[in-house]
């Protein structure tokens, strides 16, 4: 199967309990017989690993992309076949160490151990180890990686953007998007189940005529616009673009698997 994320791990990322910059992230080698399961949550559920898990050294998070030095596992005893790599947060206890990413599309895998040294190179493309991609703003993704946005507990709001708004990957805080239409609404009944962010539809009430809504923006409201980080620009909303005419507007989120957005590949 393709590289993917563990839904339970992504729940923790969305809940702000993973700080990829300061937490001890490690990589473990799994045998070819390991079967990925969406229900796996902790290292203890993975079964046996090959060799000793290694920490990710010299981690960087730039534009929502996690990278680190290539892995060096040293000499590994012969007789095993490495089928995949799992990234996890090491709490010091395998029963509470959450698994985050499952990688089986890695250069050199599968690999039969023969007593020699094993090194695992990371992808040098745009994804590196893992990437939080659109519709998330890169700067917002950096804050998600750092655990500074808790989608369950923080004040997450949605604002309407005019069709003239031009997405810019450098946009970081609410003033960067310019004027919004109407009054931003708090997202109610939020969930992060399985690494998928969802909420109740947002009711903006009656909006004055004369504007055209092209997209919506999610942000964390800190109480000060200049420090309220942008999270995502969502264009795939039913009914958009929409010309306001004085009537009411309810933003309806997708009923598809990704809902508002998902950290688990489709």
Locations of the language-model features?
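Small cysteine-rich, disulfide-bonded extracellular modules of the LU/uPAR three-finger superfamily
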Residues: 1-83, 90-214, 221-266
């Amino acid at each position: 199967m393709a590289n993917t994320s563990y839904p339970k791990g992504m729940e923790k990322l969305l809940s702000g309990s993973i700080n990829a910059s300061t937490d001890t992230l490690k990589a473990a080698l799994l045998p070819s017989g390991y079967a990925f399961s969406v229900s796996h949550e902790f290292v203890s559920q993975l079964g046996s690993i090959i060799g000793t898990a290694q920490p990710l050294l010299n981690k960087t998070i730039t534009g929502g992309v996690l990278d680190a030095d290539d892995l060096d596992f040293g000499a590994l005893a012969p007789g095993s076949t490495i089928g995949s790599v799992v990234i996890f947060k090491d709490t010091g206890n395998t029963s509470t160490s959450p698994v985050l990413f499952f990688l089986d599309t890695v250069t050199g895998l599968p690999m039969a151990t023969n007593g020699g040294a094993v090194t695992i190179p990371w992808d040098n493309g745009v994804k590196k180890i893992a990437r939080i991609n659109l519709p998330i703003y890169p700067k917002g993704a950096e804050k998600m990686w750092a655990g500074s946005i808790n989608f369950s507990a923080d004040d997450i709001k949605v604002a309407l953007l005019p069709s003239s708004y031009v997405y810019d990957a450098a946009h970081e805080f609410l003033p960067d998007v310019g004027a919004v239409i109407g009054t931003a609404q708090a997202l109610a009944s939020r969930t992060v189940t399985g690494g998928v962010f969802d909420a109740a539809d947002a009711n903006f009430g009656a909006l004055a005529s004369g504007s055209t809504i092209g997209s919506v923006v999610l942000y964390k409201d800190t109480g000060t616009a200049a420090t309220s980080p942008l999270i995502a620009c969502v264009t795939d909303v039913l009914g958009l673009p929409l010309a306001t005419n004085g009537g009411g507007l309810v933003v309806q989120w997708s009923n598809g698997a990704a809902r508002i957005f998902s950290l688990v590949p489709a």
